[in-house]
């Protein structure tokens, strides 16, 4: 567990390519090294690999998206106690569920209704902006950055946004 670099052994071709665009300085080290002074952590790996000490070493008001399921890289209450300001997981039983179920039904509905032949970057950005706009400014806070996954407005608004960005 640590920083993936061009010198990391056992990478497939896609992982190797990702190191070229995500680790420009070809940095190496442990996960703890990577989190020192970081503003954000996006984890999609394994349960309980982030410690409170790692979170405490991050910049003030750090954001953590601990997406491993069913057990995240760090539990939200532990991350917050260690200094994180915003924590999201893939789980519906914690605030800020970050899950593709928020995006995909609306993306596919919009693409199908608009008879799109491909999903473009513009369509994905329109979907993201629609999702971001679903939490009213007055309700936006550290524990409410995402719309509820089963909010009936989500799929409809995302579909409309996607349809409006289909190129003929």
What spans do the regions from the language model cover?
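Glycine-rich phosphate/diphosphate-binding loop of Rossmann-like nucleotide-binding domains
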Residues: 1-46
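Short acidic, glycine/serine/threonine-rich loops at helix termini
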Residues: 5-11, 53-55, 75-80, 99
């Amino acid at each position: 567990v640590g920083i993936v670099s061009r010198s990391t052994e056992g990478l497939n071709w896609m992982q190797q390519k990702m190191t070229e665009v995500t680790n420009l300085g070809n940095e190496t080290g442990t996960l703890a090294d990577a989190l020192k002074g970081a503003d954000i952590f996006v984890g999609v790996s394994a349960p309980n690999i982030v410690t409170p000490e790692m979170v405490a070493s991050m910049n003030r008001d750090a954001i953590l998206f601990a997406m491993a399921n069913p057990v995240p890289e760090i539990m939200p209450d532990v991350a917050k106690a260690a200094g994180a300001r915003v924590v999201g997981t893939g789980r519906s039983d914690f605030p800020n569920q970050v899950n593709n179920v928020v995006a995909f039904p609306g993306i596919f509905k919009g693409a199908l209704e608009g008879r799109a032949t491909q999903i473009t970057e513009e369509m994905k950005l329109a979907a993201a902006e629609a999702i971001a706009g679903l939490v009213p400014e007055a309700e936006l806070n550290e524990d409410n950055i995402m719309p509820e996954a089963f909010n009936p407005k989500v799929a409809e608004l995302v579909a409309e946004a996607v349809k409006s960005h289909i190129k003929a």
